[in-house]
């Protein structure tokens, strides 16, 4: 009997140590990593890379003891270890990252990254290592949720204040005036902020649907309102694309329960109220607020605000007097699904028609953003067209494993002079997650990277029937993929993504 107790202790002590260290690491990454900056946003890419490298490096070193203990028990047959598909996809991405470094266009940048794109091999190895250790040792804790809410709220408030040309923390002190509208928080560029927000705000929206405590519900309502305000203040199209996908999914799943449906109306109402608040700020502050452009201009028009106010009134009446039986909600979900598929089909036909028949007629209008040409998406079309064309001309080995992490600049360099002449700058990434992964780690890397995400989404969708909170995993990953259509992964969001994938798979594994 004594020997049995000693064996249990031998197993549990390293395991408890691993869980404790992992919890501290998660608190650091969720609570400190997003908000940390050295007093200025100059060189913020390098600062974030160093912060993550040190934090993850120390974490992985400390985790060697519990990992080796756990591995020894698995090797001796005292403990069974199941390798799921997410691990296989992570392994594929790891192989692609390693091989791509060996055949990289610039091996130094492939290993270390460059001054703008810091996601070189070292960072990716730390991300993948974090994923595996978090997946095996993480224990979900309410403290992590609060740390995440506080840190992301700080990011939102920074974005709102700076959009109003009010830098209360003097973060922009060394940034030239022409760039100040772009750098709005300790996460730097507005597009980097959207990538981070896609990993936190959608989860809060789902939590609002599910929560039962009145206090938590009120906190989440305030959090969502501020987060939505920041999305508008970022003035970037990727934020609109991301939140549109979130709402389309949220509405669909909300039909499953009357409480969810009514709370979904509240979330949409908070979104409209946030837009009205931003509109009022734009009227009151006028020139003291950075101007809106592209799709953002639609949300600061009086017609949009009036329409939103009408919808708020309708939602209020629906919540007070609506009679949403289970049968009505089921029919509503069915109609909604059919309508969305029809609209999606019509949208695809519309986009194809614009590109092949009416591209010249819509030039200079908002619809021109749907036409694939050099001017599309603030120059994104330029880099997308050339990226796709050059990738097809690469040697077969590079098509399989890529040109090296951090090497997109070298990949696109043949158009250096042309980019400087047309845009006054050079593209360091393709502003598209798929193209970024494809160029840097090849087809194998694409299968591994997106396989991890899609498998986790599929597992979350399946598990949510028994554990409703997994719906948050599905929607936030969908939101990340949506904004990734216009943005590329960066040092600001990639570590958080891999940690969330590990945390999600850990939680889902514990429910088996």
Descriptions of predicted regions:
Residues 10-29, 33-39, 55-67, 98-102, ...:
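Alpha-helical transmembrane segments of multi-pass inner-membrane proteins
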Residues 36-50:
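Short, hydrophobic transmembrane alpha-helix segments
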Residues 65-81, 100-112:
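Transmembrane alpha-helix boundary signature
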Residues 83-91, 263-269:
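Cytoplasmic-side transmembrane-helix entry/capping segments in multi-pass membrane proteins
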Residues 109-114, 232-237, 484-491:
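Membrane-interface helix caps and helix-loop-helix hairpins in membrane proteins
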Residues 114-118, 158-172, 341, 352-407:
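Aromatic-rich transmembrane-lumenal/periplasmic boundary elements in polytopic membrane proteins
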Residues 189, 379-427, 441-445:
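TM-adjacent membrane-interface loops and short helices in multi-pass inner/ER membrane proteins
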């Amino acid at each position: 009997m004594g020997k049995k107790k000693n064996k249990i202790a031998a197993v549990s002590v390293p395991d408890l140590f691993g869980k404790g260290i992992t919890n501290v690491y998660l608190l650091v990454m969720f609570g400190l990593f997003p908000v940390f900056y050295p007093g200025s946003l100059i060189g913020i890419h390098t600062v974030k890379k160093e912060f993550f490298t040190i934090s993850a490096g120390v974490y992985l070193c400390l985790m060697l003891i519990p990992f080796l203990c756990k591995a020894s028990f698995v090797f001796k047959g005292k403990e069974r270890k199941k390798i799921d598909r997410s691990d296989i996809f992570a392994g594929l991405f790891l192989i692609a990252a390693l091989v791509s470094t060996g055949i990289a266009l610039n091996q130094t940048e492939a290993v270390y990254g460059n001054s703008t794109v810091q996601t070189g091999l070292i960072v990716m190895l730390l991300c993948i290592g974090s994923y595996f250790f978090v997946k095996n040792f993480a224990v979900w804790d309410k403290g992590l949720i609060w740390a995440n809410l506080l840190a992301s709220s700080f990011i939102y408030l920074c974005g709102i204040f700076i959009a109003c040309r009010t830098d209360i923390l003097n973060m922009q002190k060394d940034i030239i005036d022409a760039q100040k509208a772009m750098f709005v928080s300790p996460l730097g560029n507005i597009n980097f902020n959207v990538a981070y927000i896609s990993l936190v705000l959608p989860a809060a929206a789902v939590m609002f649907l599910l929560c039962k405590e009145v206090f938590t519900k009120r906190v989440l309502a305030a959090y969502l309102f501020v987060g939505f305000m920041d999305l508008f203040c970022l003035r970037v199209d990727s934020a609109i694309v991301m939140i549109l996908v979130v709402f389309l999914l949220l509405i669909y799943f909300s039909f499953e329960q009357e409480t969810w449906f009514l709370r979904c109306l509240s979330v949409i109402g908070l979104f409209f109220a946030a837009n009205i608040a931003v509109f009022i700020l734009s009227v009151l502050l006028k020139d003291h607020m950075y101007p809106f452009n592209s799709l953002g201009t639609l949300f600061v028009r009086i017609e949009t605000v009036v329409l939103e106010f009408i919808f708020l009134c309708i939602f209020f009446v629906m919540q007070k007097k609506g009679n949403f039986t289970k049968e009505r909600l089921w029919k509503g979900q069915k109609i909604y699904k059919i309508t969305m598929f029809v609209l999606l089909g019509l949208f695809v036909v519309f986009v194809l028609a614009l590109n092949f028949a009416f591209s010249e007629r819509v030039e200079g209008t908002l619809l021109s953003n749907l036409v694939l040409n050099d001017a599309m998406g603030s120059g994104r079309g330029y880099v997308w067209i050339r990226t796709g064309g050059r990738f097809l001309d690469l040697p077969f080995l590079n098509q399989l494993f890529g040109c090296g992490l951090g090497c997109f600049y070298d990949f696109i360099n043949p158009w250096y002079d042309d980019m400087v002449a047309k845009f006054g700058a050079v593209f360091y990434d393709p502003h598209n997650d798929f193209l970024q992964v494809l160029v840097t780690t090849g087809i194998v890397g694409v299968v591994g990277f997106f396989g991890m995400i899609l498998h986790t989404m599929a597992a979350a969708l399946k598990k949510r029937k028994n554990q409703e909170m997994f719906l948050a995993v599905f929607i936030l990953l969908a939101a990340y993929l949506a904004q990734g259509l216009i943005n590329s992964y960066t040092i600001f969001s990639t570590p958080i993504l891999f940690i969330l994938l590990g945390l999600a798979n850990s939680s889902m594994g514990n429910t088996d």
